[in-house]
Curated annotation (Swiss-Prot):
The keyword 4Fe-4S does not apply. The chain crosses the membrane at residues 308-328, 357-377, 389-409. It comes from Talaromyces verruculosus (Penicillium verruculosum). Keywords: Acyltransferase, Glycoprotein, Membrane, Transferase, Transmembrane, Transmembrane helix. The keyword Metal-binding does not apply. Acetyltransferase; part of the gene cluster that mediates the biosynthesis of chrodrimanin B, a meroterpenoid that acts as a potent blocker of insect GABA-gated chloride channels. The first step of the pathway is the biosynthesis of 6-hydroxymellein by the polyketide synthase cdmE. The prenyltransferase cdmH acts as a 6-hydroxymellein 5-farnesyltransferase and produces the hydrophobic metabolite verruculide C. The FAD-dependent monooxygenase cdmI further converts verruculide C into verruculide B. It is found in: Membrane. One of its GO terms (molecular function) is acyltransferase activity. Belongs to the wax synthase family. This is Acetyltransferase cdmC. It is a multi-pass membrane protein. GO terms for cellular component: membrane. Compounds in the chrodrimanin family such as chrodrimanin A or verruculide A exhibit strong inhibitory activities against protein tyrosine phosphatase 1B (PTP1B) and therefore, they could potentially be developed into drugs for the treatment of type 2 diabetes or obesity. Furthermore, chrodrimanin B, the end product of the pathway involving chrodrimanin A or verruculide A, does not exhibit the PTP1B inhibitory activity, while it functions as a potent blocker of insect GABA-gated chloride channels.
Length: 417
């Protein structure tokens, strides 16, 4: 079979991008050429997956490489499933060539569909800070300053999280995260549950800020040079206060980068192929299952790139466990609403519901997160940030800087800390 050398990887990546831009800009919705491109895109992604770099040296390189399967699914979505049509505007007029190429390029980099008719729901709004505060700086440059300050603060949080992992002695690492410890739930003692809780908290805090770094920096640069506007960059993640159910954890708090694409693929299976009734229980939970299967595949590819030999089963079960979690959650909510409908609408009832929900989500993540991350934590070496501030200033000073930074960001920039 035809095989491309590893040195041609930039050619593969650029060919994929140019092909999708060309098809979006020059072909109509449901064009035969779009469907004929699917085998070509499949061949390209196969080559990308089987010919990764020999060494994945840092977090950003790992993130780019692990997103290869998602990029493929996203391209299939915008070309064939959602089938974006850039050759017609709302008035049936053919837009200019430059506008179509620009829109095609943006759709590739905009998996949340921000500013389009396909924008996913529950994306956080642009902060009110930009409307309330006025001064000698324009809205654009206030946005740039705020984003850069948040970038530095979040970078420091990620640096602290990575350093806590790097500085752990190998003997202690093996004792805490050794093979099989992620599955020790029933017989786990208080110390093991404490480790599970701390590992989950540190991981989710680090990951939450890590996924935001490129968004903060990219938005600051592009808006600073005038290529984009403030309102094209809603926050990547929502408020932790909304994460009182498992559905809200993914649908409101976490980033929505995968939602449009994976939902389009799952709807294709359930509605077009199986022709299940919309909003039926079977369609709903089968959609959930398909989305999480795709998500598991994407993240397992990331663990493969990281060189984790035992990192396949855990991440897969972690994502699939949420389907069972949704079933339990929906059943309990239905029973609660049926028995205590009037009482649950009071402010006290809502507070109790959300407090109980937060405890439920925290417990679920404490149980399941180690399935995903313990294989990673067992590694002696990990990806490094380009520059470690913790190595320069020390852990205690870094933690103090995070605390002071949080106060400044909250009071000066009205940031959602």
């Amino acid at each position: 079979m035809l095989s491309l050398e590893p040195l041609s990887r930039p050619v593969l990546d650029s060919s994929q991008t140019l092909l999708v831009i060309f098809l979006l800009a020059f072909t109509r919705q449901n064009s035969i050429f779009r469907y004929l491109s699917i085998p070509v895109l499949t061949f390209i992604v196969k080559e990308q997956i089987t010919q990764p770099p020999a060494v994945v040296e840092n977090f950003h390189q790992w993130l780019n490489e692990s997103s290869v399967p998602f990029n493929y699914l996203h391209h299939i979505n915008i070309l064939a499933l959602t089938s974006i049509d850039l050759r017609n505007d709302n008035n049936g007029v053919l837009p200019g060539l430059f506008d179509r190429i620009k829109s095609a390029f943006i759709y590739q980099l905009n998996p949340r569909g921000v500013g389009t008719r396909y924008q996913v729901k529950n994306i956080p709004p642009v902060p009110e800070y930009y409307k309330k505060r006025k001064g000698y700086l324009s809205q654009r440059y206030r946005f740039v300053v705020r984003q850069l300050c948040l970038f530095v603060w979040q970078y420091l949080i990620v640096d602290v999280g990575c350093s806590l992992w790097h500085n752990l002695p190998d003997q202690e690492r093996f004792a805490l995260f050794g093979p099989g410890t992620e599955w020790n739930i029933i017989n786990a003692g208080p110390q093991q549950w404490k480790v599970r809780l701390m590992a989950a908290m540190i991981f989710w805090t680090t990951a939450r800020n890590a996924v935001d770094l490129s968004h903060r920096l990219g938005s600051a640069v592009l808006t600073g040079i005038g290529a984009t506007s403030v309102h094209e960059w809603p926050p990547m993640c929502g408020s932790l206060r909304d994460a009182y159910t498992l559905r809200n954890l993914w649908g409101k708090w976490w980033h929505q980068q995968l939602r449009w694409t994976l939902s389009s693929h799952s709807n294709f299976v359930t509605r077009r192929l199986l022709k299940l009734p919309r909003r039926s229980l079977l369609e709903r939970y089968l959609n959930n299952a398909i989305v999480h299967v795709f998500s598991a595949f994407i993240h397992v590819n990331g663990w493969r790139l990281a060189g984790i030999p035992d990192g396949y089963i855990g991440p897969s079960l972690f994502y699939m466990s949420f389907v069972g979690g949704y079933l339990v959650e929906d059943f309990v909510q239905h029973i609660w609403a049926t028995l205590f409908r009037s009482r649950s609408r009071t402010s006290t009832g809502i507070f109790f519901e959300r407090l109980t929900g937060i405890f439920w989500v925290a417990t679920f993540l404490t149980v399941t997160t180690p399935w995903w991350i313990y294989p990673l934590l067992r590694r002696e070496h990990s990806f490094a940030l380009p520059v470690s501030l913790v190595e320069s200033v020390g852990m205690n000073n870094a933690l103090a800087m995070i605390g002071v930074g949080a106060f400044i960001l909250k009071t000066r920039f009205d940031a959602n800390i």
